[in-house]
Design a protein with these regions (language model features):
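Hydrophobic ligand-binding cavity/cleft-lining segments
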Residues: 1-53, 146, 159
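Short beta-strand segments that buttress and anchor functional surface loops
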Residues: 4, 57-63, 83-89
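A short, structured loop/turn motif at beta-sheet edges
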Residues: 20-24, 51-54, 77-81, 98-107
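Beta-strand elements of well-folded, non-transmembrane domains
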Residues: 21, 64-66, 114-118
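Hydrophobic pocket/interface hotspot
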Residues: 25-30, 36, 58-60, 75, ...
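Helix-adjacent hinge/juxtasegments
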Residues: 64-78, 85-86
Length: 159
């Protein structure tokens, strides 16, 4: 996010899940933009590389709160343990995924930081947005871990 955006009030939501597979299997799902609609509940379609790199732009369509919107994700960082994106889909969000080994499994963490809406209506919208982002994030991580587990051939464990 730009400096002027980071000076405004923002809020953060986070979630984590354990995947019963090695981290590299989860990372492959994260970095393949064509797979995002399979595990991110709001994403309908994407156009982007099979393995994103810093500087890539992934464009797509999403369904947010009943509205179809065009969006894009600018890939900011691709460390060995995850992905950092600047996402613009109705609102701007900095989305970070980190995957770390946990024995034979993987701990997958996701964090979303977004600008808080302002004004009286903004407070109501902010409340609804936080709830939606938390739910969306939990669903995304549930789906991501299940897909990674299925890809690795391990048994899928319900959360």
């Amino acid at each position: 996010m730009s400096q002027s955006q980071s000076a405004r009030a923002s809020f953060e939501v986070g979630a984590e899940r354990v995947a019963k597979c090695p981290p590299d299997v989860v990372i492959r799902q994260l970095l393949d933009a064509s797979r995002w609609p399979r595990w991110q509940p709001e994403i309908v379609a994407t156009v982007g590389p099979e393995r994103v790199q810093v500087g890539d732009i992934v464009r797509g369509h999403a369904d947010l709160l009943g509205f179809g919107v065009a969006g894009q994700a600018a890939i900011e960082e691709v460390p060995d343990d995850g992905l950092v994106e600047d996402v613009l889909v109705g609102v701007r969000m900095r989305v970070t995924y980190r995957v770390e080994p946990r024995g034979a499994d993987s701990l997958v963490r996701a964090t979303i930081v977004t600008e808080a809406p302002t004004g009286v209506s903004g407070r109501v919208l902010g409340f609804l947005l936080r709830r939606r982002l938390r739910r969306m994030q939990r669903t995304a991580l549930d789906r991501l871990t299940r897909l990674a587990e299925a890809q690795s051939g391990t048994e899928i464990i319900e959360p």
